[in-house]
Amino acid sequence: PKVTSISAGGANTFLTVDATRVASPGEKTADVRNLGRVVADTWACGRGIVGTLGNGRWTHMQGTPTKIPALSGLFEYDEKARAAIPIRMHSIAVGSTHAAAVMDNVTYLDASESSGENDTNWGADVLWWGGNEFYQLGTGKRNNVANPMYIRPLDMDAEGEVGRRGEQHRFHITPKHTVRIGGRKVSVEQRVECGRNVTAVYSGV
């Protein structure tokens, strides 16, 4: 296994780990399925009484890393690579009692008004968990959350205007891409930050 990132804040630490399937002692290489397959897992330690560990438990303190099932062992099919690839974390923002994970999933930003009506842009998934006393998770409620979860899009009024209120959309953020502003090409992306009982989503250059 290889630790690929460490994020810390409040009383918690999160680690992302890549593990490659190898043959165990006594196993024949020819008999091992998925040899060389990489699995990306996310682990957490620290305080969990308000759900910040993200493992579905309300543990007071976790001294050794515990796996976060909702953020581990995820795969998706990549059309370009024509293969299943692991979904890794792009980043984890850690606040005083809550956290948000931006996934490094496949994104698509080429849909336009001239493309078909079924052509849709989609960005990076974001999951939220932990303390929610001040509505910082964006769920519209104040209950703490022990499992990472998706939230609805921020502009629900616009969703209703186009007749989509019955559909289950979720909040995405735009990955880094190039746009033209005032005649100049600028690289922009949306980012998530968690602080002390507050969350911010903003566009950065």
Regions found by a protein language model. Give the residues of each.
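Periodic beta-strand elements of RCC1/NHL beta-propellers and select beta-solenoids
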Residues: 1-10, 15-77, 84-94, 101-205
